[in-house]
UniProtKB/Swiss-Prot annotation:
GTP binds at D14, H15, G16, K17, S18, T19, N131, K132, I133, D134. HAMAP family: LepA (MF_00071). CDD domains: EF4_II (cd03699), EF4_III (cd16260), LepA (cd01890), lepA_C (cd03709). Its main location: membrane. The keyword rRNA-binding does not apply. Residues 2-184 form the tr-type G domain. The lineage of its organism: Bacteria, Pseudomonadati, Pseudomonadota, Gammaproteobacteria, Enterobacterales. This is Elongation factor 4. It is found in: Cell inner membrane. GO terms for cellular component: plasma membrane. It is an enzyme of class 3 (hydrolase).
Length: 599
């Protein structure tokens, strides 16, 4: 027990945590040099392509320290992006300490700060590490001051290393062994194991990543899931050295994987406690707080035959990603699908890509919306996550939109640009503090504006230097309206959007213009209108294609031409009554880009 160290690495995106973990694995001999490749722990193709960590991974390594002792390091890699902060809090729950990795050139960023506070709230020992000291732009002294000033932990003797060149990585390991406390727990008490993560394997069923808090788990034991009371057999268990290695037992304080041949996806939920069936523990371990999705979007399979496969895929994915929420939904335009809740737009993109790649599905996504709180005239309060569920205007007493509290850290020279952006997004400044050359800004901005494209625009106005962390603050009454799109007089539910009354005419006009470019021309005119209630605010027409019926007439009487034109006109009229308009996938995505052109 005293030689076990459980830790994770927290850092902002691109501050080098995956590279540092590669070096740690190499030094401890977890993989032979032949098997070593860059970013070993980012095993998903998607993670490698985008260069970000999405899933938390765990590795168990043996490290022979300078004091002659051999320590078992259980190391859990965590993502750095704001949309995956839930993964981080799950990983931290299994640790006693964390390495706070900060880029010695860039300094502290908002995300580092948020994850660091999460770690401190859980009473973890935070060990600061200054990475990338081999870069010419590195200024470790300034960054150490910044860490002390902004984060408030002592950093003057922070370990300095360069994960890329391998300089100072052994110092990191020595400091880790010295500063991070060993796990607490009673090896003789009844078994209590916390499920940190689980995923679905086609051959083994559900595989769970567990942290043993008390007692010992042995192969072949009967194991009980505390929330459901189901009993399973521990068929296989072991550790990752990044490869799966079988063991006969997992001892108190260790982190490892477990296979119990659970075929039911909901058999072992994340955050649940496992105990021995023979000698069960009295109470479950405190799990994780459930996260509320911030962004909702409808996902529909392109062909309705894929619905079953889509449902299974979502089930398997939600096992692996506990922050994904979904419920069935049907749309008149798109058929049957699911309404899914995500933590942010990046999360939504990643889930959609994983569904398309790993499960081979073709999907249509509707525009993302946030949850609104609506008080009806009969004084009941309902929560609306889709524009089509919004009650009629005359039944709404008050519509409240979610407000996000945004913490931004940025260099002083970009302050003006960022403030302009926040004001444009209907933001209200609540705080501003200067730390050396950095400024910490706090704004309250409507969640709908934040999730749409705020992050991208913040990055572009500040040349990538500003960083953002946001969380839900409260609901606030606001003058929001629903803009409907009518095509040939029929409402298309999948194209509706909720927007602020002041922006509605611009958004409506822009949407109608975009639709006009995307809908292919037919044999008859297609009228595209944007409406608030019964009030039309914008209109555009996709002109018909027409055959020149007068081509065969040479000269002759005008009544002959009139007759032909009249005949054509009647045909078009009849066609318009029965004709229906096919909307291409791009049309549904056009809503995403409304308001992007800085309007």
């Amino acid at each position: 027990m005293k030689n076990i160290r459980n830790f994770s690495i927290i850092a902002h995106i691109d501050h080098g945590k995956s590279t540092l973990s590669d070096r740690i694995i190499q030094i401890c001999g977890g993989l032979s040099d032949r098997e070593m490749e860059a970013q070993v722990l980012d095993s998903m193709d998607l993670e490698r392509e985008r260069g970000i960590t999405i899933k938390a991974q765990s590795v168990t390594l043996d490290y022979k320290a300078s004091d002659g002792e051999t320590y078992q390091l259980n190391f859990i890699d965590t993502p750095g992006h704001v949309d995956f902060s839930y993964e981080v809090s799950r990983s931290l729950a299994a640790c006693e300490g964390a390495l706070l990795v900060v880029d010695a050139g860039q300094g502290v960023e908002a995300q580092t700060l948020a994850n660091c506070y999460t770690a401190m709230e859980m009473d973890l020992e935070v060990v600061p590490v200054l990475n990338k000291i081999d870069l010419p732009a590195a200024d470790p002294e300034r960054v150490a001051d910044e860490i002390e000033d902004i984060v408030g932990i002592d950093a003057h003797d922070a370990v300095r290393c360069s994960a890329k060149t391998g300089v100072g990585v052994t110092d990191v390991l020595e400091r880790l062994v010295r500063d991070i406390p060993p796990p607490e727990g009673d090896p003789d008490a009844p078994l209590q194991a916390l499920i940190i993560d689980s995923w679905f394997d086609n051959y083994l069923g559900v595989v769970s990543l567990v942290r043993i808090k008390n007692g010992t788990m042995r192969k072949g034991d009967k194991i009980k899931v505390m929330s459901t009371g189901q009993v399973y057999n521990a068929d296989r268990l072991g550790i990752f050295t990044p490869k799966q290695v079988d063991r006969t037992e997992l001892k108190c304080g260790e982190v490892g994987w477990l296979v119990c041949a659970i075929k039911d996806i909901l058999g072992a939920p994340v955050g649940d406690t496992l105990t021995a069936a023979r000698n069960p523990a009295d109470k479950a371990l405190p799990g994780f707080k459930k996260v509320k999705p911030q962004v909702y979007a409808g996902l529909f399979p392109v062909s309705s035959d894929d619905y079953e496969a889509f449902r299974d895929a979502l089930g398997k994915l939600s096992l692996n990603d506990a922050s994904l929420f979904y419920e069935p939904e049907s749309s008149t335009a798109l058929g049957f699908g699911f309404r899914c809740g995500f933590l942010g737009l990046l999360h939504m993109e990643i889930i959609q890509e994983r569904l398309e790649r790993e499960y081979d599905l073709d999907l249509i996504t509707t525009a993302p919306t946030v949850v609104y709180e609506v008080e009806t005239t009969s004084k009941e309060v309902i929560y609306v996550d889709s524009p089509s569920k919004l009650p009629p205007l005359n039944n709404i007493q008050e519509l409240r939109e979610p407000i996000a509290e945004c913490h931004m850290l940025l260099p002083q020279e970009f302050l003006g640009n960022v403030i302009t952006l926040c004001v444009e997004k209907r933001g209200v400044q609540t705080n501003m503090v200067y730390h050396g050359k950095q400024v910490a800004l706090t704004y309250e901005i409507p969640m709908a504006e934040v999730v749409l494209d705020f992050f991208d625009r913040l990055k572009s106005t500040s040349r990538g230097y500003a960083s953002l962390d946001y969380n839900f603050k409260r609901f606030q009454a606001s003058n929001m309206v629903r803009v409907d799109v009518l095509i040939n007089g029929e409402r298309v539910d999948a194209l509706a959007l909720i927007t602020h009354n002041d922006n509605a005419p611009y958004r409506g006009r822009e949407l109608v213009e975009k639709m006009k470019d995307l809908i292919p021309r037919q044999q008859f005119d297609i009228a595209i209108q944007a409406a608030i209630g019964n009030h039309i605010i914008a209109r555009s027409t996709v002109k018909q294609l027409r055959k020149n019926v007068l081509a065969k007439c040479y000269g002759g009487d005008v009544s002959r031409k009139k007759k032909l034109l009249q005949k054509q006109k009647e045909g078009k009229k009849r066609m318009k009554q029965v004709g229906n308009v096919e909307l291409p996938q791009e049309a549904f995505l056009a809503i995403l880009h409304v308001g992007k052109d800085g309007k």
